[in-house]
């Protein structure tokens, strides 16, 4: 159930990808790259929303916060469905993101209510394993809808999925935050919690690392349709190639769930970040030698490796960043999510809008983010701070 709720984020993003060009043309986008904003504005809504639902869920309980989020998501889906110009569409997408921030943020707190340390990383990895199968099939779903109906039918599908998921959540998931553990809403408490999160090296460092990973990934997502459908001329085969890459993240999350109890979160993250950074540096040099037009098989091979490494790191970085924040799990998850998304959205938009008919902007994004992650994680791991507990 939690994976399905998280998957609405992926479905709302990836089902759009095959339709971006058509939506942009129908709604009067002035430039081809402007269609990427349909993806980016959802992430922008996520960034703002996560700062609200964490404190709200600490005060009212987890379920009421999710109910509010789903209501906004459904309104945004309806607005996007009826949009007649790009500005209205972007407003609807922002509302969708604002609403989807609830399950994205609160579900981390729900898991933290019940687990911690490597056990939390293991649960999050299994959630991610199921969650990632949606990105694998979402572009195929979107492409299939386009073959038989208008792109607006994609938003009608999202509306239906939102209603079904909300009903399942309401009926099946019990409240995980007991009344005695709830904290009265207070701006002073929120400010204090933000200061605590941002002043704790472990939480801040791993949250920044999450933002850097998401920056490169958002840049890839925004330009994936243009790269595969236009540059490599895959046409309707684009969803298949996208699915293969999405499954690399899912398989990494599954593998991480199996290995994290044995090797520990820090070791797996350290190995993955080092390997992915070296590969990115080498592939960037190779891409330059091809004029930004590497053969498809080399591009796919590189992306499979990078996304597998990102899949290993993502669940572990989430768990390590949350480790010191158990006493403020709701607002802690909110600040983490908001900060990482506020880092990733502008950087991801910059990477996507830099698309120039070559893969150089996307590969540059992966390379630069990899180098910065190495620097940030080195800072976290070498400067004395409260240790992250884990079982090696």
Question: What residue spans do the PLM features occupy?
Answer:
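Conserved MFS/SLC helix-loop-helix module at the cytosolic interface between two early adjacent transmembrane helices
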Residues: 47-87
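Paired small-residue
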Residues: 72-79, 87-95, 297-303
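Juxtamembrane intracellular "pre-TM" segments in multi-pass secondary transporters
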Residues: 174-206
